């Protein structure tokens, strides 16, 4: 049996972050965020579509597991900042304390987020997605509704809101069968 030769994979050059300067490290994040006892500590990530430039920004609150999803028209940091500010600005300022992100170029508008939302932004170490484990788990749940080959250009905002609602009303084992919305209401009174 003769095997066909495989085409070589094209690799992107590593993006340079030296010009950005020092980013606030996850090591400096308040310990309350790690303990998941206090409302107001968020993690975010970008879910990419292979079919188009459209992406979905996933944001989750660590203590309650509440999910916020938003559609990004492209992968720029301006668009990422817009979606995060749009989705979190409806919360009272006392519920906005920290946001933990990865070091992707789409997340470099962090100073604008700090100013707009009055919260502190921290960055996980490079290639350490487990430092934002809650959010990586959330992305897996979102992928159940929007598999890898989903073209986000064809997904409506209404469909994204529906998935957000389904995830927020889904009972979680870690909360003893309570939903994230129930936990949020309990913790906020």
Over which residues does each language-model region extend?
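Charged alpha-helix within mobile-element recombinases
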Residues: 104, 113-189
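Short, surface-exposed connector motifs at secondary-structure boundaries
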Residues: 64-68, 91-96, 145-146
């Amino acid at each position: 049996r003769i095997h066909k030769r495989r085409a070589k994979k094209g690799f992107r050059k590593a993006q340079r972050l030296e010009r950005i300067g020092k980013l606030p490290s996850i090591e400096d994040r308040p310990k309350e965020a790690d303990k998941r006892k206090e409302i107001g500590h968020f993690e975010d990530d970008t879910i990419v579509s292979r079919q188009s430039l459209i992406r979905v920004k996933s944001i989750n609150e660590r203590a309650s597991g509440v999910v916020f999803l938003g559609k990004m028209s492209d992968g720029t940091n301006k668009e990422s900042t817009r979606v995060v500010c749009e989705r979190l600005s409806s919360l009272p300022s006392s519920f906005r304390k920290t946001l933990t992100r990865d070091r992707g170029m789409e997340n470099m508008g962090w100073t604008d987020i700090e100013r707009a939302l009055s919260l502190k932004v921290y960055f996980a170490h490079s290639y350490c997605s487990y430092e934002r484990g809650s959010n990586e788990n959330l992305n897996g749940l979102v992928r159940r509704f929007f598999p890898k080959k989903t073209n986000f250009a064809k997904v409506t905002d209404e469909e994204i809101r529906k998935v957000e609602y389904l995830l927020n009303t889904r009972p979680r084992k870690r909360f003893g069968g309570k939903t994230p919305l129930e936990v949020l209401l309990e913790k906020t009174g």
